[in-house]
Amino acid sequence: MADYYPLIARAIAGLDPNAPGESRRALYERARAALIAQLRSVQPPLSESEITRERLSLEEAVRKVEAEAAQRAREA
């Protein structure tokens, strides 16, 4: 299982700090779509459970990045 946290955290760090939450949500949606497309193109094909496991790993990385962003906002 891949560790998506560094990729997501780096992508978010590249956004304007004053950008609205919608910018982060759009980035997450692009990451989700790219991941699913990439996983579905793997040969031999991955099982649905393998795809779900990777998707959930990405979602955990998103939750972690969002929790860190919320913590920074509270401290500001």
Identify the residue ranges that each predicted region occupies.
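A membrane-associated low-complexity tether/scaffold signal
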Residues: A2-P17, G21, Y28-A37, S41-A76
